[in-house]
């Protein structure tokens, strides 16, 4: 439950208990009620009493959208409020940091911070929070830390930097709570060493409670359990328990060639075959810009979300997408390539443990060479397939199939949330079609069929099914020559120019105008991220679809207006008489040349 607008599906709700029965502070209960939460979810009804009454460390494994955020925020807030009541003599304006929340990405840090602000609305005088995950000058950070926030939200890397360079500004002697959210993703991002170093600064031997929240439980998490936890309570909420809610997600896969991916996208979005907002996932930043530029050729607007863009711009794009400003978002999900493991070992892990998904990555040298050409710095603390709260997504389109079954689960988890229906469509390139069209080729598609079989196997364990889907080729073929023209105009040079142009525009909006937008928030709404880049030549005629290409039922009925003469056939008698008189008068006149003397 990441915001007040998005409530957990009914399948997650625990009707047998209410928030009032959890003995929470009245101010916290008032904030919970204000945000529309009536009953806790399953994970909340189990975790909150264990944390508050029994003071247990907690390791929780639960699916996306089950209310994990509030499951740890409520105990943290309640514990701090209780501490303030019982230790009024220690509070002299120099309060200590009482809670630390670690998350893998900046986007998730901002999301948690937003939820926290809503929960401490009526106790903001007693609890202050600070999100240090965003880039800010050290002088600004130091001044913010002088306010002594009770809760600090950060990525492990940012917190480690703070402790190394400015540890005197943070007092951790009375730390009560440590939360590590999305633990498996934190470890995938390579923060294991940072966590070990952070542990040296924490009062682990005192009464420090730890929350480890994760989608999977693997050996790495077991190591963190030994390092951070003492006799923890382990909560597991399997997908089987909420499978009745999963039938709201319909999954399709389409076997197609590499070039036909672009053709199908053109047809789908130009003819409006998908109603509602669509989230498109690609595996590479260049792929995202190529798809955007190709769609621009046909007048289809979209916006880009990737790790190159400034953090402020990324957050603004997500916010506007959630407010329905954009309906088509192309997101680059390249975080799955950070951690590389042997595929065979992953297969063994899958057979030995049903709780742990396979983690496999592409070791293709060609893909690495392609990445070598990009000199623009990426933000390693960026993740889009997990954590980011995309609201009311009608369809998730895997333009590029993810390289792991685990990543597939997280991608499709962006739709069919909060009890709503959703559709997931995945393009799969058969091995026999791989490499036939060099300009549209991407190396990871070589393994699409293998990945698809693993995805189908994984989903079948959950009682879910991926259905094959095929388009009417006769209807699609009519659009092919137009796609060939549009695709030909999007060259590699055009893609590079588009990346540079987009980055310059977003940096300008993010840095130079940041203060202006803070003073004039109404003008921020007019800042758009789906403007046409078109460094490539845009052919205007491609933006309109001729009627003869449309299916019969989609063609606009033409009105039969009949023959339209240049002059009106019907004339009044008055006009006829006037014409006759004029002709007589003009005819009676003599020719001046003949009568000239």
UniProtKB/Swiss-Prot annotation:
Compositionally biased region (Basic residues): 568-587
Stated name of the protein: ATP-dependent RNA helicase DBP9
Comp. bias regions, Acidic residues: 340-354
Entry's Gene Ontology molecular function annotations: ATP binding; ATP hydrolysis activity; RNA binding; RNA helicase activity
EC number: 3.6.4.13
Disordered, as annotated region: 340-373, 521-540, 561-597
Protein residues bound to ATP: 62-69
Gene: DBP9
Catalytic activities: ATP + H2O = ADP + phosphate + H(+)
Chain ranges of the Helicase ATP-binding domain: 49-235
InterPro entries: DEAD/DEAH_box_helicase_dom, DEAD_box_RNA_helicase, Helicase_ATP-bd, Helicase_C-like, P-loop_NTPase, RNA_helicase_DEAD_Q_motif
Source organism (scientific name): Vanderwaltozyma polyspora (strain ATCC 22028 / DSM 70294 / BCRC 21397 / CBS 2163 / NBRC 10782 / NRRL Y-8283 / UCD 57-17) (Kluyveromyces polysporus)
Motif mapping: Q motif: 17-45
Protein family membership: Belongs to the DEAD box helicase family. DDX56/DBP9 subfamily.
Protein's GO biological process: rRNA processing
Subcellular location: Nucleus, Nucleolus
Entry-linked PANTHER family: ATP-DEPENDENT RNA HELICASE RHLE-RELATED (PTHR47959), DEAD-BOX HELICASE 56 (PTHR47959:SF21)
Segments carrying motif DEAD box: 181-184
Domain notes: The Q motif is unique to and characteristic of the DEAD box family of RNA helicases and controls ATP binding and hydrolysis.
